């Protein structure tokens, strides 16, 4: 019986019933022997056929994502005297090219690393110098926008002093690899920034959608205020980028310890990038100290000491590391402690007023 059916299927034999059924889309499921003993022509055999319903859509099997890797490159950047904007652009493209070569999804530059451009501009008092620097904003934006597209990478372009309505703001720009640009204003201004540059604060906490998840950017001093990270996490952020600029180790440790605390409090990752080296003849930028890094919550599924990767202190270098965005999602609801889930909203809350 099996041989007979196979020959009908291969068109070697013609069967009035079976050939017609197969030609109309019926599918042979199996042969049933001794199905009808009185059918002498078929020796009691029968075929079980299925005619598929073309309008039927089977229920899809749910597939759960178990891992979502994101590769981050953090630049620990050395401040240096420059002779032109082109020299600055060459140095920036070098780092972007390195990150792209290692297939990074994001590259993070430090806070106000564009202040090194003042080394070739006229030596003026700080209030005038920062406005001269702000005049280079279109060139800065054009440079990093082109680099993000050319090298297919999302760039957090450190931060840059920008003039809006004749006020100076410290702004971190996100350059997506699709060519779009977003910005986050520094919300808390340090005493030094007010004294030397007259910087004004922003008042919006942004969470940006990217092709690798939702991110938040907090510029240096901002990471020392836990309310910002709480609000950003409530808005969906899973990764916080912190460009910073500190002149000595005490200031650096404030940024670093607060970034690590924010990771534990909110179940997020944090990447921090700072400047190193000396910059003569630029007011308030004489010395720099940094040990840039990528930090995690503190639990079994994450890195030892909650440090995913870390630079050697105070030298120009990069670190490149993969983080798993699915881990932080699961950690918030199944970690050893549930800092996010166990908040006492009946006792306290963090409210964004604007």
Residues covered by each model-derived region:
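Short hydrophobic/aromatic beta-strand or adjacent loop that forms the aromatic wall/cage
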Residues: 43-48, 169, 203-205, 287-290, ...
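Short beta-strand scaffold segments in enzyme catalytic cores
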Residues: 157-158, 171-174, 206, 272, ...
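A short C-terminal boundary segment appended to hydrolase-like catalytic domains
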Residues: 323-354
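Terminal substrate-recognition subdomain of acyl/acetyltransferases
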Residues: 1-70
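CN hydrolase (nitrilase-like) catalytic-core segments centered on the catalytic cysteine
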Residues: 134-156, 223-316
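Generic N-terminal amphipathic, Lys/Arg-enriched alpha-helix
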Residues: 66-81
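Cys-nucleophile CN-hydrolase/nitrilase-fold catalytic domain and related Cys-dependent amidase chemistry
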Residues: 85-177, 182, 246-261, 265
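Active-site catalytic loop in hydrolytic enzyme cores
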Residues: 146, 162-239, 248-261, 334-337, ...
């Amino acid at each position: 019986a099996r041989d007979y059916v196979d020959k009908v299927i291969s068109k070697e034999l013609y069967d009035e019933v079976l050939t017609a059924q197969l030609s109309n889309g019926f599918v042979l499921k199996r042969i049933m022997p001794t199905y009808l003993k009185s059918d002498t022509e078929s020796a009691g055999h029968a075929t079980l056929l299925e005619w598929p319903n073309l309008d039927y859509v089977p229920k899809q099997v749910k597939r759960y994502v178990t891992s979502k890797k994101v590769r981050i490159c953090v630049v620990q950047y050395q401040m240096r005297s420059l002779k032109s904007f082109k020299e600055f652009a060459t140095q920036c493209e070098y780092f972007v090219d390195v990150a792209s070569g290692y297939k990074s999804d994001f590259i993070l530059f430090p806070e106000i690393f564009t202040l090194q451009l003042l080394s070739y501009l006229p030596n003026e008092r700080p209030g005038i110098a920062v406005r001269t620097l702000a005049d280079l904003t279109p060139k800065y934006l054009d440079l990093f926008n082109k680099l993000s597209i050319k090298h297919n990478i999302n760039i957090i372009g450190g931060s840059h002093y920008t003039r809006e309505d004749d006020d100076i703001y410290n702004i971190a720009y996100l350059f997506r690899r699709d060519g779009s640009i977003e910005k986050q204003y520094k919300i808390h201004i340090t005493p030094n920034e007010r004294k030397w540059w007259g910087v004004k604060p922003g008042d919006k906490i942004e969470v940006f959608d990217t092709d690798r998840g939702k991110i938040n950017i907090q510029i240096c001093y901002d990471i020392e205020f836990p309310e910002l990270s709480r609000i950003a996490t409530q808005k969906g952020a899973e990764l916080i980028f912190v460009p910073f600029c500190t002149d000595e180790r005490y200031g650096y440790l404030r940024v670093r310890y607060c970034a690590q605390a924010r990771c534990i409090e909110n179940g997020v990752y944090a990447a921090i990038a700072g400047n190193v080296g000396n910059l003569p003849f630029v007011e308030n930028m004489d010395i720099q100290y940094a040990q840039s890094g990528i930090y995690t919550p503190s639990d079994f599924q994450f890195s030892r000491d909650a440090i995913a990767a870390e630079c050697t202190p105070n030298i120009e270098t990069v670190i490149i590391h993969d983080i798993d965005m699915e881990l932080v999602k699961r950690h918030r609801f199944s970690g050893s402690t549930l800092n996010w889930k166990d908040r006492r909203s009946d006792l306290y809350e963090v409210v964004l007023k604007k």
